[in-house]
Amino acid sequence: MRPWPGHRWTSQKSSSVANWPPCTAPRRPTPRDTSAVWTVSPKDSWGTKPVDFTACDTLYDSLITRRVIPLAQKAVTAGLLPDRALELATGITEDCLGPATIPVLVHGDLWAGNRVVDSHGYSWLIDPSAHWGHPMEDLAMMALFGGFGPECWESYDYLPVDEDLIPVFQLVPLLVHTVLFGSGYAPSTLRALEASH
């Protein structure tokens, strides 16, 4: 990942992140391209929890079918979430993911804890779960645990961010945290599942 100077997320520094050109699939798929590749990650887990990053033809299959529903099933089976959580997960439709878009390379685990500052004052993004995904995956993760100041968010003003989409793109990290760390994450996960419809 590229570094930028400074210990704080200021508009100058964060805009360098916001203005990085999106890295898209080599053949530049179109939003309606059914052969566009979604996911494909060198990792097959999120932390210690297995997560399916198999290449898929659609965002829905990649995000909902292969990640959200299986993780919801694991959480329900473990007694960490009520049965209703799986019903909510399986009730998410393709329309709930917003307008069609092409896959871009995302960090995949972009929270403030995955930013380190070196002895020269440069910030580095570490521990990626990089894959071909939706840009909202990183923005939703940034919003989930905080740590990014208003200057950082102002750098993204040019993006057509639909805040209604944030919950659905927070589901994978919330479900992973529920499965890994227990039912303390259940209320937030259920709220995100309900808001994803």
What are the roles of these predicted feature ranges?
Residues 4-7, 111-112, 129-132, 173:
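Short, solvent-exposed loop/turn segments at secondary-structure junctions
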Residues 168-177:
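Short helix/strand-capping connector loops at secondary-structure junctions
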Residues 177-197:
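ATP/Mg2+ or Mg2+-diphosphate-binding catalytic cores
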Residues 59-61, 73, 102-105, 112-167, ...:
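Active-site Asp-x-Gly
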Residues 1-58:
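ATP-binding pocket architecture of kinase catalytic cores
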Residues 78, 82-124:
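A mid-sequence, solvent-exposed acidic-amphipathic segment
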Residues 41-93:
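Active-site catalytic-loop/activation-segment of kinase and kinase-like phosphoryl-transfer enzymes
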Residues 24-28, 160, 179:
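Protein kinase-like catalytic domain
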